[in-house]
Amino acid sequence: RSARERRGKSQRAAPGNRPPPGLPPRLGNPTTEYLERVLFQLEAHHVIEKALAVDEKEPTIGALIFGSGMGAISTLALAVCRAGDAILAGNVYGCTDSLFRGLGKFGVEAVFCDMGNVAAVEAALDAHPNVAMVFLESPENPTLRIADIEAISRLTEPRGALLVVDNTFCSPYLQQPFRLGADLVMHSLTKFVNGHSTSIGGALLGPFRFMKTDFFPWYKDVGATPSPFDSWLNGMTVQSLAPREAQQSATALEIARFLSTHPKVASVGYPGLPDFPQADLVRRQMRSGGAILTFEVKGGVSAGEAVMNYFGRKDTPMELAVSLGSCITYIQHPASMTHAVVPEADRLARGITPGLIRLSVGLEGAEVLVEHLGRALDLT
């Protein structure tokens, strides 16, 4: 049977079906359950509305909170895949990539393709009928390439593969993959949901029977569960998600416009710009361009390192860091930082060029960030 048939899809659900009181807190606690309900409402409010319209008291989506995003992905892979299956993934987070490749020792094949090319996804699915799970990020990191989630869902549905969307880069404010046909949605809560870099966390949302029955034994046995304190921190900070992301997106657009006209910048990648290659797709599935942008500085690796050296000083408003989603602006140079150990040919194949710089825009004033970017570029 297919992964979809093996795991099933329920018709009725509730976001917080937990074991009775008195059991170990690893199996659930009120603080974590509160965060589950909040994320459920953010990602699946359209399901709630539909249920209310037909006088149903129980929606169809369940949520579970993890100690990290990788805890969520690892537990998901163990629960969904078995020997002989394959995972089809795009250009994903490095640890996700490593995890999927590492599953080969258990007989699970990792297959990779360009998720921004629907025809390539279809060809990969046809070539690997044993795909149990399609896992994608949209936008991808750090290239910001967008996957057409709805089109891909039309490919996975008849083939019995589960479509999993890592919605970390967007958060529920900017994108709701369930509306577009995703079966499961995951988050690294560490990023935009927390928004303050104060906690690590992960989340997985999906059909209730899968989340609370088939999947729950893996959740409790793998043990990648959060502490109540981390759930409390994330439950507090998520309340400001909408105003934070709205402001961050607006600031990112201003910065992208500035960089687009700068003589030392070869190109700018920002989904909110009208000339972004996939602008039509962005308008269909995202609220705005988001808080992440990239730009290619002329001069290659040395120019990128010069910009990093400027922001490595303590008197600048940006922090040299590889994380994202904080109210503080983070800047990083993939070729000399996150992807320095990746062979240059592999970096180029992934769209990571020598002068590529990634910005995760925070809540500082746009004029301050633009001023310091200008100063940094003057040094290249």
Can you describe what each PLM-predicted range is?
Residues 3-71, 75, 95-103:
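Conserved N-terminal alpha-helix of the aminotransferase class I/II PLP-enzyme fold
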Residues 42, 237, 296-300:
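A structural micro-motif recognizing beta-strand termini
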Residues 49-264, 269:
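Conserved PLP-enzyme active-site core in the AAT-like
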Residues 155, 254, 258-262, 306, ...:
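Generic non-transmembrane alpha-helical segments
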Residues 267-357, 361:
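Conserved C-terminal alpha-helix-loop-beta "cap" of PLP-dependent enzymes
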